[in-house]
Amino acid sequence: MKKLFVLLAVLPQFICGQDLLEEIDLETSENFETAAFKGLKVVNFESTKMVSEKELYFVVSHRFGSIKTGIEDFFGLDQAVTRLNLIYGITDGINVSISRSSFQKTYEGALKLRLIRQKKESFPLTIVWHNSAQINTSLDEDNLPGLEFKHKLGYATQLLVSRKVNEKLSLQLAPTFFHNNLVSVTEQDNSQYALGIGGRHKLTKRWSINVDYGIHLNRAATSPFSNPLSVGFDLETGGHVFQLHFTNAQPMNINNFLGQATGDWSEGDIFFGFNISRVF
């Protein structure tokens, strides 16, 4: 299994003037399938959607605390996490991004490359390679004697493989490798493997339901963390893209939502959140 993931790893909207529905429903002259996913995320996992050349996306992502706390924390309002993300399209198939999350004061840089696109009556899949590096700036040498800068670093690489099955249904697999130089569970390997499974079903012209699930493949037996399961809705109206969702993982960076999901759907320990994008 490790050899498989290593092989995969080394393979090479607030307001805007144009209605995004027109953009995503446009078919190119090369007969590519379009609009497999409306958002840059399925829910937690990256989708195969790309930012177009010379476009800049500003994405605000917000996750409230657990709704299980009830009125004490106003159903999670007092324990919110926010992530700000800037994504730029160098070309239609090359995106770069930089973000900052309040969860562990995490900074992240990422590179997203589209390797191949699904084409009608030809190639059946879109394949995108996503790579990221992050820094956990909340770690403090006063609390962790011997802490070095390298211990704050984490890395992730994913191969995103999607298929637009028909006008309503799109599916995606995301084999993932991620590495943390410092782990919170002693028995946990620094190098970790996961498989993301996700999909989108179009409900109306402007609404869709999205689901994704991450299967951690080498989680330590003593780990208190869970596999992330998320359910959300995408809404497009005018230049706005809203993603509303429930998930058992409050953090939004790859290493963190796959490695540190603390919620439990069976106990109602879940987090409500949203993403909103503006295109420049």
Each language-model region and where it sits:
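Bacterial Sec-dependent N-terminal signal peptides
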Residues: 1-22
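Intrinsically disordered, low-complexity segments enriched in Gly and acidic/Ser/Thr residues
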Residues: 223-224
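A mid-sequence, solvent-exposed acidic-amphipathic segment
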Residues: 168-217
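Small/flexible residues
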Residues: 4-5, 165, 202, 280
